[in-house]
Amino acid sequence: MTPTAASELLLSIESTCDETAAAVIRRDGTVLGQCIATQETLHEQFGGVVPEIAARAHLERILPVIDTALTQAKVRGEDLTAIAVADRPGLAGSLLVGVVAAKTLALAWNKPLISLNHLHAHLYACQLIEGAPANIYPAIGLIVSGGHTSLYVCRTAIDLEYLGGTIDDAAGEAFDKVAAMLSLPFPGGIEVAKLASQGNDKAYSFPRSMIHDPGDDFSFSGLKTAVRYAIVGPGRQDFASLDISDQVKRDVCASFEAAVVDVLVSKCRRAIKRHRNRNNDPQNSINRLIVGGGVAANQRLRRDLQAAADKDGFELWIAPPHLCTDNAVMGAIAWKKFEAEQFASLDLDITPGLQRGF
């Protein structure tokens, strides 16, 4: 009997940072079961993700999370067609837990193993939007998250060309650091956005680093330093003892968020314009932008990107907010590698880190 899209099932596993996630996805894209275990309360007291704590939490949760996804889907391991796991990039200990689990299950159930690039999967989440075209590629892709801020030419879901990225801090990292300066709860990016919506985004004139640079690289460390000096002045280390008014916090957040979004939107517009009529070849023209990653849930970024798309006449698809943060559903990209017969061996190793070029 020939398998059909309704009978072929994928188990997707995600453990790149501090979310342990699994999903069972049919080949037609239907999600039959999914589970995410977050670690926010474990890392809250530290103001950021502690790699060793994250890895230990993954160890405790990986099997229950997988079991929950399978139970929701009402399938057994033997019913699966393939197993996919994100093996790059991310925290070494976190990645290792997911990859070892996937390899073990692939061996035990005699299923093909598929390795995933976590960042490429974030972009593929745009393909999962209701109403998206059957093939959302080619496109310019923007990943904006706590660990990465990068631009790509996405020829297909699994054929991406890295254009450029941050040379220092990622946008999401800058959000979290500013939140820490203002003693806001973890995770800080959400809290900064909340206060920003109530503040004056012109109260502080923060730098838009590299906004006029013709390339595709980003820089946010200078912005982070400018915010620090606006709050405490040069040289001071102690933020906890500061008495910062609520209005100042709102205005700092609004001005900071505006600076980040201005840079992201400007770089995307420039990349689209450059590739729209590349070499005057309509066959290679790209007039679509896809956006993924945790910061892609930011409402100001979504609004300003849509305004740019309307003004410049390009097509915009941003991952739905629930698929912007780390999840296993975006692992549906594995079906593209399955179709291309791009399988991993049981010797699969992790590729951790936040290096440029992923």
UniProtKB/Swiss-Prot annotation:
Molecular-function GO terms, alphabetical = iron ion binding; N(6)-L-threonylcarbamoyladenine synthase activity
Q: How is the cofactor bound?
A: Binds 1 Fe(2+) ion per subunit.
List, separated by semicolons, the cofactors it needs.
Answer: Fe(2+)
The record's section on SUPFAM superfamilies has:
Actin-like ATPase domain
User: Where does it primarily localize?
Assistant: cytoplasm
Q: What domain of life is recorded for the organism? A: Bacteria
State whether keyword Repressor applies: no
User: Can you say where in the cell this protein is located?
Assistant: Cytoplasm
Keyword check for RNA-binding, yes or no.
no
Enzyme Commission number(s): 2.3.1.234
CDD domains in alphabetical order: ASKHA_NBD_TsaD_bac (cd24133)
The alphabetized UniProt keywords are: Acyltransferase, Cytoplasm, Iron, Metal-binding, Transferase, tRNA processing
State any GO BP term from the record.
Answer: tRNA threonylcarbamoyladenosine modification
Per UniProt, where does Fe cation bind?
H118, H122, D326
Report the coiled-coil segments: none
Q: Which family is this sequence assigned to?
A: Belongs to the KAE1 / TsaD family.
Q: What does this protein do?
A: Required for the formation of a threonylcarbamoyl group on adenosine at position 37 (t(6)A37) in tRNAs that read codons beginning with adenine. Is involved in the transfer of the threonylcarbamoyl moiety of threonylcarbamoyl-AMP (TC-AMP) to the N6 group of A37, together with TsaE and TsaB. TsaD likely plays a direct catalytic role in this reaction.
- State the name under which the record lists this protein: tRNA N6-adenosine threonylcarbamoyltransferase
